[in-house]
Amino acid sequence: MSTAKAPTLPASIFRAYDIRGVVGDTLTAETAYWIGRAIGSESLARGEPCVAVGRDGRLSGPELVKQLIQGLVDCGCQVSDVGMVPTPVLYYAANVLEGKSGVMLTGSHNPPDYNGFKIVVAGETLANEQIQALRERIEKNDLASGVGSVEQVDILPRYFKQIRDDIAMAKPMKVVVDCGNGVAGVIAPQLIEALGCSVIPLYCEVDGNFPNHHPDPGKPENLKDLIAKVKAENADLGLAFDGDGDRVGVVTNTGTIIYPDRLLMLFAKDVVSRNPGADIIFDVKCTRRLIALISGYGGRPVMWKTGHSLIKKKMKETGALLAGEMSGHVFFKERWFGFDDGIYSAARLLEILSQDQRDSEHVFSAFPSDISTPEINITVTEDSKFAIIEALQRDAQWGEGNITTLDGVRVDYPKGWGLVRASNTTPVLVLRFEADTEEELERIKTVFRNQLKAVDSSLPVPF
């Protein structure tokens, strides 16, 4: 039993949706121990002594996870160690094992020297002030002490079987699977093959150095190899997973990148066809076309804040059956558990495409599309980013448009929209624009440019 007092941990690692830092600098083995103590204490306070723990394929994983588990055990928690698995497999463990708490040690798509913690306590994904509360527990030494236990649990076969039994493929497909040397490589290619597809694996060996490309399918440059392979192999589809497998990137048979909001169009159509009136949630970065489409299918569109933890909370509150974020997190509550799961989402996509006579390019090109910018980032400071947004919400003049201020400022005009919001994870302002003509796109950009300059004339506006 440890009665030692914790060192002061850097405040910077306690972020909006998770805890994340640079290994050996802001995040050490000792830090992992005390974070384990805080999470264990919080879980026990909520009446949950059982905690599942997993880790991704990062090089720092084994050392950090050992200390994380020790911290949980020293609280008196019963730990189920599920080993090296994708994040959704850890979430799955926290749904189907005895306990409803779980900690995933993962750096997601950050560079190799990062690691972090995604945390579920008693069925709730922690965010914002709940993550700050863990830091306060450590500072106040408000920590449980006890003698817990650790059990190794092989959860992968159970997860594998549940998805395999859930998905019905109408015909086999040829799929290129790029795991970017992330932890999805331990299951995604094998599972997709078990569904009846022929799989061409790309970078599916787990390697925490990420020697081939960064495991972030949200950036087009990381999909170059996948696109080339899909074309060379004449494949039906390309799938790319991020470093911890909770996001998926999609490429059609002709090499077109399908952005997550367009993926959500297909998923919404499918889910609402069986569940008329279902709520479908999407974040403020998604296309305006989703709103009319979801309504047209007979569903109820719900726009919400960006952030996987925040979306999960909103799903619980609304009873939504499906949610998606522009970052690539997709959450199925229909036939699944409601957590973000890149691997399950990929399987659902294959099921839908297998039932369609058209190729994937034609399936997606049938949906309406606008001209859009990629995500534009303006570097500011941690302190100024929220102040700028507050000033824009308070003072800016946007003209004739529908203004949404639930996360930054989004203005929907008759023929397009613009968004400016503060990133919750980095000191940047995030912007995105979309319109049905180039002229309208430029007009909306000009409005936003002028309003930003009015708030702070020194701001760089790279658009």
UniProtKB/Swiss-Prot annotation:
Protein's name in the database: Phosphomannomutase/phosphoglucomutase
Impact noted for substituting residue 108 to A/V: About 5% activity, still subject to substrate inhibition and requires G1,6P as an activator; phosphorylation occurs at a different site
Induction: By D-mannose 6-phosphate.
Required cofactor(s): Mg(2+)
PANTHER family: PHOSPHOMANNOMUTASE (PTHR43771), PHOSPHOMANNOMUTASE_PHOSPHOGLUCOMUTASE (PTHR43771:SF2)
Gene assigned in the entry: algC
Cofactor mode of binding and number, as noted: Binds 1 Mg(2+) ion per subunit. Zn(2+) can substitute, but yields a catalytically inactive enzyme.
Additional comment: Most crystals have Zn(2+) rather than Mg(2+) and are catalytically inactive.
Result after altering residue 325 to A: Reduces KM and Vmax approximately 2-fold
Assembly behavior: Monomer.
Protein EC: 5.4.2.2, 5.4.2.8
Resulting phenotype, residue 110 to A: KM halves, decreases processivity as dissociation of G1,6P intermediate increases 30-fold
Description of activity control: Requires glucose 1,6-bisphosphate (G1,6P) as an activator. Reaction making glucose 6-phosphate is subject to substrate inhibition, reactions making mannose 1-phosphate or glucose 1-phosphate are not. 1-deoxyglucose 6-phosphate competitively inhibits glucose 1-phosphate. Inhibited by xylose 1-phosphate.
Gene deletion effect: No longer expresses O-antigen LPS side chain or A-band LPS, sensitive to serum, resistant to virus E79. Has no phosphomannomutase nor phosphoglucomutase activities. Does not make rhamnolipid.
UniProt-listed PROSITE patterns: PGM_PMM (PS00710)
Single GO MF annotation: phosphoglucomutase activity
Catalytic residues (positions): 20 (proton donor), 108 (non-phosphorylated intermediate), 329 (proton acceptor)
Residues given in the record as alpha-D-mannose 1-phosphate binding sites: 17, 308, 325-329, 421-425
Record region (Topological domain 1): 13-142
Protein role: Highly reversible phosphoryltransferase. The phosphomannomutase activity produces a precursor for alginate polymerization, the alginate layer causes a mucoid phenotype and provides a protective barrier against host immune defenses and antibiotics. Also involved in core lipopolysaccaride (LPS) biosynthesis due to its phosphoglucomutase activity. Essential for rhamnolipid production, an exoproduct correlated with pathogenicity. Required for biofilm production.
Positions of region (Topological domain 4): 375-453
Positions where Phosphoserine occurs in the chain: 108
Binding site for alpha-D-glucose 1-phosphate: 17, 285, 308, 325-329, 421-425
Family according to the record: Belongs to the phosphohexose mutase family.
Region (Topological domain 3): 260-364
Source organism per UniProt: Pseudomonas aeruginosa (strain ATCC 15692 / DSM 22644 / CIP 104116 / JCM 14847 / LMG 12228 / 1C / PRS 101 / PAO1)
